[in-house]
């Protein structure tokens, strides 16, 4: 695994590294996705852990499921290792394509400029009533982001993790 880690480290900050986990990923192979830029997991079929439930049961006498130990939901909500959770393999690949379309190919290129249907002088009427008069009242900042970005295109990273934050 040393060669894989070496390549991850050399590529870090140079090219985008995206790991798409569409099944079990166990043992030393788990370390590589954990140090890539983005991890996409499929809910219900993806699992990442160093050692499986059987070994945990033998060593600690604790019974834990594959899902609780290293499923997509666990890594999306508790460990923060996964950045996106897909409902199936097809959606995982769609997310990967969408993510790649937003990133430069390497550190020497600028981020892609995508065409927009939004007018340069459009108004954002929903913003007028979004922030309440009472500063102690909450409001949905995602609405502000969606109203502000072109075509309402917003892909939130780690939307299930640290819910008091917006990850952009």
Tell what function each PLM region has.
Residues 23, 58, 95, 111, ...:
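A sequence-level detector of short, solvent-exposed, charge-rich linear segments
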Residues 166-168:
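Conserved small/polar residues in nucleotide/adenosyl-binding loops
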Residues 1-108:
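Conserved catalytic cores of soluble enzyme domains
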Residues 88-138:
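Terminal amphipathic helices with adjacent charged low-complexity linkers/tails
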Residues 150-164:
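Flexible, glycine/threonine-enriched loop-and-boundary segments that flank and lead into catalytic domains
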Residues 12, 57, 75-77, 121-129, ...:
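Gly-rich Lys/Arg/Thr-decorated short loops/hinges at beta-loop-alpha junctions or inter-strand turns
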């Amino acid at each position: 695994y040393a060669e894989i880690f070496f390549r991850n480290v050399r590529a870090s900050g140079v090219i985008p590294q995206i790991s798409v986990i569409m099944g079990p990923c166990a043992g030393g192979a788990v370390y590589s996705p954990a140090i890539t830029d983005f991890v996409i997991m499929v809910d219900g079929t993806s699992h990442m852990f160093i050692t499986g439930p059987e070994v945990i049961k033998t060593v600690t006498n604790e019974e834990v499921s594959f899902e609780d130990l290293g499923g997509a939901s666990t890594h999306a909500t508790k460990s923060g290792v996964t950045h996106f959770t897909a409902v199936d393999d097809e959606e995982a690949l769609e997310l990967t394509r969408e993510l790649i379309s937003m990133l430069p190919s390497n550190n020497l290129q600028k981020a892609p400029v995508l065409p927009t249907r939004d007018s340069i002088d459009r108004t954002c009427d929903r913003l007028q009533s979004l922030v309440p008069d009472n500063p102690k009242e909450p409001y949905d900042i995602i609405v502000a982001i969606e109203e502000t970005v072109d075509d309402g295109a917003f892909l939130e990273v780690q939307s299930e993790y640290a819910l008091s934050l917006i990850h952009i």
